[in-house]
């Protein structure tokens, strides 16, 4: 039985700003780009969230919801330093750390003997140490599998934690909304709802085969998650699956020619990123992404063994066919990377009985 902890810092970027600039405390603040430059909110504090401000929201719209919102440009170098401090705390308890971003990570503490092996007590200790070292609060979810640990970390925010023991899983997943499962977005959830599938209990009444016929490989994953099954282990060295570049435009654009003028810089920057971070990796697809003035987006991709500038422009033309009169506010290009693993299989470790407190 694994013991997985998902640690998620509470409104991380905004919390760092409030820590370093106490005059911001108690006021609605957001870290993000300027509204006059079509910036986007990266994160915001809880005071701002009361007004409906959310991550990935246009700064201009956020200011309409909350006229007193204080926009902070952000200090990525500081956030990275604090993230490194947090990582050092994790490393005192386990080497099995899978960072998801600067402010969240999975930890496998199955073999940790501290605090009598209790995952609950270990999570409490980690959160306490993070606060002592950084002055910031963190929330945590504890469960035997990754996806439930991630869901649990959101159930007692901010500055809290939630435990899902093995015995709790059957009842917990029964009422769990499918949209809460990581990987199930709004579009997929809407498709599932048209089939009468809203909760995990609804999926449990289906066969794996019927779901796979409808959704392919994801159908099988969904079936497993609805039973509370997630065989994925912790990946301390997560393999990068793609490299991309995108830009939010100063003004909406509408034509292929206008997009054409933006593409060379994007492709050049993408080429540089591939050279720096994925030079030894083979690519397997190219992707063009457009976000429209209604904030809906579309992506077009095609298999490719090497980067082709012409293919990017061909994909751009296809993506523009979906514009339907809307303005384009964001344009992006990316490549998918082949896995570095060769002949990778499923390795299962069988652990002997441990005299510990479990969860």
From Swiss-Prot:
Q: Which Pfam families match?
A: IMS, IMS_C, IMS_HHH_1
Cytoplasm listed as a keyword: yes
SUPFAM superfamilies referenced in this protein's UniProt entry, alphabetically: DNA/RNA polymerases, Lesion bypass DNA polymerase (Y-family), little finger domain
Positions binding Mg(2+) in this chain are: 8, 103
Q: Site Substrate discrimination: list residues.
A: 13
Active site (record annotation): 104
Q: Taxonomically, which superkingdom? A: Bacteria
* Enzyme Commission code: 2.7.7.7
Task: State the compartments where it is located.
Answer: Cytoplasm
List, separated by semicolons, the cofactors it needs.
Mg(2+)
The protein's predominant localisation is: cytoplasm
Q: Which InterPro entries does the record cross-reference, listed alphabetically?
A: DNA/RNA_pol_sf (IPR043502), DNA_pol_Y-fam_lit_finger_sf (IPR036775), DNA_pol_Y-fam_little_finger (IPR017961), DNA_polymerase-Y (IPR050116), DNApol_IV (IPR022880), IMS_HHH_1 (IPR053848), Rev_trsase/Diguanyl_cyclase (IPR043128), UmuC (IPR001126)
Listed under catalytic activity are: DNA(n) + a 2'-deoxyribonucleoside 5'-triphosphate = DNA(n+1) + diphosphate
Q: Name one GO biological process term.
A: SOS response
Which residues does the UniProt record annotate as the domain UmuC? 4-185
**A GO molecular-function descriptor:** magnesium ion binding
Q: Which UniProt keywords apply?
A: Cytoplasm, DNA damage, DNA repair, DNA replication, DNA-binding, DNA-directed DNA polymerase, Magnesium, Metal-binding, Mutator protein, Nucleotidyltransferase, Transferase
Function in brief: Poorly processive, error-prone DNA polymerase involved in untargeted mutagenesis. Copies undamaged DNA at stalled replication forks, which arise in vivo from mismatched or misaligned primer ends. These misaligned primers can be extended by PolIV. Exhibits no 3'-5' exonuclease (proofreading) activity. May be involved in translesional synthesis, in conjunction with the beta clamp from PolIII.
Q: How does it assemble?
A: Monomer.
Under HAMAP family, the record lists: DNApol_IV
Q: What is this protein called?
A: DNA polymerase IV
Q: Which gene encodes it?
A: dinB
């Amino acid at each position: 039985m694994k013991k997985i902890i998902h640690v998620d810092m509470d409104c991380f970027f905004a919390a760092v700003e409030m820590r370093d600039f106490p005059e911001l405390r108690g006021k609605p603040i957001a870290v993000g780009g300027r509204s006059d430059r079509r910036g986007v909110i990266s994160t915001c504090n809880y005071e701002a969230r009361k007004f409906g401000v959310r991550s990935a929201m246009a700064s201009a719209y956020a200011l309409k919801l909350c006229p007193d919102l204080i926009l902070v440009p952000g200090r990525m170098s500081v956030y990275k330093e604090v993230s490194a401090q947090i990582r050092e705390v994790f490393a005192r308890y386990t080497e099995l750390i899978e960072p998801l971003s600067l402010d969240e990570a999975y930890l496998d503490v199955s073999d940790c003997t501290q605090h009598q092996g209790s995952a609950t007590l270990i999570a409490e200790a980690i959160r306490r140490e993070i606060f002592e070292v950084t002055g910031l609060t963190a929330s945590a979810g504890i469960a035997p599998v990754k996806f439930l640990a991630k869901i649990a970390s959101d159930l007692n925010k901010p500055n809290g934690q939630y435990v899902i023991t093995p015995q709790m899983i059957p009842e917990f997943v029964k009422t769990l909304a499918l949209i809460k499962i990581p990987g199930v977005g709004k579009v997929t959830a809407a498709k599932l709802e048209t089939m009468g599938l809203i909760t995990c209990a609804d999926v449990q009444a289906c066969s794996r085969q019927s779901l796979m016929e409808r959704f392919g490989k994801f159908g099988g994953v969904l079936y497993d998650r609805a039973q509370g099954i997630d065989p994925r282990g912790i990946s301390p060295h997560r393999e990068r699956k793609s490299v991309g570049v995108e830009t939010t435009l100063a003004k909406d654009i509408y034509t292929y020619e206008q997009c054409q003028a933006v593409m060379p810089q994007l492709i050049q920057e993408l080429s540089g990123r591939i050279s720096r971070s994925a030079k030894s990796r083979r690519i397997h697809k190219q992707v063009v992404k457009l976000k429209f003035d209604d904030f809906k987006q579309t992506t077009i991709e095609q298999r490719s063994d090497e980067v082709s500038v012409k293919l990017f422009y061909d994909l751009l033309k296809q993506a523009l066919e979906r514009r339907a009169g809307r303005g384009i506010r964001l344009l992006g290009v990316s490549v998918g990377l082949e896995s570095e693993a060769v002949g990778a299989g499923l390795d299962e470790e069988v652990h002997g009985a441990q005299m510990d407190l479990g969860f």
